[in-house]
């Protein structure tokens, strides 16, 4: 029987529910259990694919092409699982399916209401995730905080789950905030008490409390919280601010969180103890890196940390392999000109230009890529970064001065980057990109092939609607650009590189989405190796 863990949050947002869910998932996975991660987002958008990165942050992409919340990236990297369309559900997606069923007549003329139709759909999504992944445990994070109007249907649905699948198969984990008042020099438990009271008022009794705090929570306070919340004191866990995400699962294990979970849910785990030896080595490496490598990221959304979270994480993962801390300096692409590029990039050891949409900042990207190419600074381009590297090469090596991307200038004579054929008549924006996992054939004797340890075929995740215009391939190759990765039918350019440079590689796909702390993605591994000048130092 599948077990279900629901992670909710109270008091304030951004407490780290996703990190809590991921940490529990990692511990259970390392006990030999199959874990499925899931995120419910209460916004009415169908998915975050068309949302402004400044509002929502990065859009994460799964193997099956789902555009999802960035928390799925945390799940994949921390738990080391693959997520799917069953892993991210929004209010918009729920209502869309309910209304489609109503239009088909599936409700036989009945009045469609939040209860039972919307709540039933939410429960269906939870149980479908279990069925489609054949998992032991589904861990579902409920976005927002208890008391939010938007999350009410989700709270009601997970309340009903306990009755439908049995109390022995459901566990409620509530993440709450214990503020420290510096003036009074004391922690306050009242917000936690009120948050749990609100949760109980809608029929959910939490089985475990995770207390987020910047200071250790004394035992007397835990006893007090237990008295007011009816949560056994042994099931009250503290989650202190940590210097590294690696610390969180280890802290939970020290407090016996995984054992409490398997005891409460009556799980017979294949391993009696979670094997966290490799995790501890990663934690030790991350805290004691010997070297530093400075990387410059030139992008469109640099003001928001979460906009490139998978990219910056992937850079750090590669840094661990070389025992080097990666110091990422982010520069707004619009701020880069021919006059200041030398000053801005003079101290960098590597340049990365990640993905994005729209024409803003393209000239700055092209200028920075040109400087990196001419001064042999290691360069990695991703998606839009690959497209701008192609445009830069056309302008400054092939001397096609009007070369551009059709996204920036649709009627340009030399559109090096053009709209994909199946996108030309597309009127909708959302969910219509080339999305998900696709294969690429790698050319022998290239840096790309070397990055992937000699593999002939790789599978990577994509999110784009523009592609390299094939009529220019011969001219590019004659001028020194190598097409080191292409689709199996040789139609779509996946990777370009200048082989005689220290490292000048750009990919149409998003390599950052498959990077893991203990397994850095190939292009990031090659890029940081070239930028740092270091040898691999395994931990």
Swiss-Prot record:
Reported EC number(s) for this entry are 6.3.4.2
Q: Which PROSITE patterns does this chain map to?
A: GATASE_TYPE_1
- Give the record's free-text account of how this protein's activity is regulated: Allosterically activated by GTP, when glutamine is the substrate; GTP has no effect on the reaction when ammonia is the substrate. The allosteric effector GTP functions by stabilizing the protein conformation that binds the tetrahedral intermediate(s) formed during glutamine hydrolysis. Inhibited by the product CTP, via allosteric rather than competitive inhibition.
Positions contributing to CTP binding: 13, 148-150, 188-193, 224
> Per UniProt, what is one GO molecular function of this protein?
glutaminase activity
Q: Where is this region: Amidoligase domain?
A: 1-267
Please give one Pfam family short name: CTP_synth_N
Domain of life, source organism:
Bacteria
A GO CC annotation given for this chain: cytosol
Q: Where does UTP bind?
A: 13, 188-193, 224
Which residues take part in binding L-glutamine? 54, 356, 384-387, 407, 465
Q: Which residues form the Glutamine amidotransferase type-1 domain?
A: 294-537
Keyword annotations for this protein, in alphabetical order, are: ATP-binding, Glutamine amidotransferase, Ligase, Magnesium, Metal-binding, Nucleotide-binding, Pyrimidine biosynthesis
Active site per UniProt:
383 (nucleophile), 510, 512
Role, per record? Catalyzes the ATP-dependent amination of UTP to CTP with either L-glutamine or ammonia as the source of nitrogen. Regulates intracellular CTP levels through interactions with the four ribonucleotide triphosphates.
Name the family the entry cites: Belongs to the CTP synthase family.
The protein's name is CTP synthase
State the gene name recorded for this protein. pyrG
